[in-house]
Amino acid sequence: MKLYDSGVYLVNGTELVADDAQAAAAIKSRTGREVTKAGAAQGTIAYGILKDHNVSGNMDKLQIKFDKLTSHDITFVGIIQTARASGLEKFPIPYVLTNCHNSLCAVGGTINEDDHMFGLTCAKRYGGIYVPPHQAVIHQFAREMLAAGGKMILGSDSHTRYGALGTMAVGEGGPELVKQLLSKTYDIDMPGVVGVYLTGTPRKGVGPQDIALAIIGEVFERGYVKNKVMEFVGPGVSNMSVDYRIGVDVMTTETTCLSSIWRTDDAVKEFYEIHGREGDYKELNPAAVAYYDGMIEINLDEIKPMIAMPFHPSNTYTIEELNANLMDILDDCEKRAEVSFDGAVKLDLKSKVRNGRLYVDQGIIAGCAGGGFENICDAADILKGASIGPDEFTLSVYPASTPIYMELVKNGAVATLMETGAIVKTAFCGPCFGAGDTPANNAFSIRHSTRNFPNREGSKVQKGQVASVALMDARSIAATAANKGYLTAATDVDVDFSKPKYHFDSAIYANRVFDSKGVADPSVEIQFGPNIKDWPAMSALPENMVLKVVSEIHDPVTTTDELIPSGETSSFRSNPLGLAEFALSRKDPQYVGRAKEIQKAQKAVEEGTCPVEAVEELRPVMDAIRAAFPEKTFGEEMKPGTLGFGSTIFAVKPGDGSAREQAASCQKVLGGWANIANEYATKRYRSNLINWGMLPFVIPEGALPFQNLDYLFLPDIRKAVEEKQSEIIAYVVKGSELKEFKLGLGAMTDDEREIILKGCLINYYRG
């Protein structure tokens, strides 16, 4: 795999020309014409689709209107509640509500099914589409029923990726979907486009997860595709089936790219024909000369079976490399865990080595990444006639949709898997986010799913539990299962893959999915459960601000799972204040109490009482601020909005992973006004902060001018935002002294600044 250090021209879809002094002459000799870099940049597939959806008239500053929206049951309640509070009357474009996360209805009594009934009644009232539990995971339904060539889909899940079908899809936090529901736009600068040039053919036994992990391992740490579009081109694309391409595509999220798009061919056309939607196919190819801001060149022949060890999809090795350096790599994983868990629990992977081989406790093939038809058929072929054994090792398989499940029943794959001792379950995202198949304490699970962040498999550090997940392809998981849990690459087994043809039966959805066909019925009464709560009132940004640092995180990356846990906690997402009680609970259990304590001062301000009396700790802080800023009238007579109080956290690089808006909104409802970071892991997390009225501060790497529990004073912060200042002066209160330092605000649109000034997106739309 080669990552180019410069931009690259793709000529006639098959030749790469590096952007150097000889590039223009080389291109002219091949095409007979002169091209400019700016002109060639318009030759990417991504540029054409973005142009078709941009309503700003300026291709540097995009205002995108999407064709369709999709959400699942741990995001759609909050989104619709926000939209309702902002004036929603009907869904202006198709909006699909799937119920693939809290499908088991096993936590919190009625609250999960209450959310589902809320979704069904909203689909009826506002004109949406409702997919009941166990019918399909969000992204498989979108592939089967929503994707279309040249279109764009916005989803409230980070793995919203349908590029292999010719659809540019973006995963964002809920507020961005709210904007689309209110017929507003998705505003971004024109993203860079990085080409992924594929040649060769994947070797037998190598699956899409292997290709994806190989890419993630190369690009993540370098930030090579961060917030850019990945465009898959080259002859190697046609050497993969569409199901295979989908398996690679969905994992591009773990590179931190913004979106993805692939060139399309007759195989994609056949996919649409199989699904009864041949009219949605569109041939997509780059222009004769297309310019890319970067290029990843991959010979598919060279990719070997991969494994992403705990606790990140980028912690990748070939299985061959892992087996050759087993104890060293396991030791490294244990040391990383000690840092990540702050010594609260001890991960013991080396005890999994038996007779020089790594033993695995659990295998899972599931969800939008693993639950595809071909993944499961190939796994069944590898396992045919085998037994997974009567010991600790278990294997669970989750087809990504009921149509896939039914076809697997018809062709015998389900029977083959069940005969081995595997359990075949319904379409459910649980194993991907800690709501199903949580392993035993200190167990090691291998999964064809999307992520392996700390505790994402469901373990609870605060209760002394730890388990771990490695990501692998379904084929190597099956090979491991055939060896009763001893880690095995699929290339090490002798198998003939049957490659049965897929037949899609739309009758299942016709019988169970509610489709309003875009017709709203205002007479339908929305069904609310007792856990579904409105968003609490949120104040506008004050003129001046006192912030307490209530958590300080120095991990290289902080995931959204650490900011607000997934798993059973997700059941409470319909209740903003109830969910907030779990914020940072697995990373910093003292965060919630500290945030709520300083929030008392802000509540006192809003009630017209004295903040210092509410939080006695503030007395010397305010004395120091008054002494340093005597011109500021911070006395008992100060008018509302003059001074605000709240909390902030520091993290090196927060926001990797999920699109969940709750990673930000939970901080907000606990009184959070800001984050301070060296950088933000993803555009979507920074957008979530802004949409919830939180300041996304950045500070250079190095020694911090403050520490946890310090108070910070931000004079004239409202004026700084109004005047579009990119840098502000802040002060840390040290005893009776104030020490000055600087914070960056980064680029923001006028609308984003106005959202922060208003206090949140809801206030912004309420006017």
Name each model feature, range by range.
Residues M1-G767:
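Fe-S-dependent hydro-lyases/dehydratases of central metabolism
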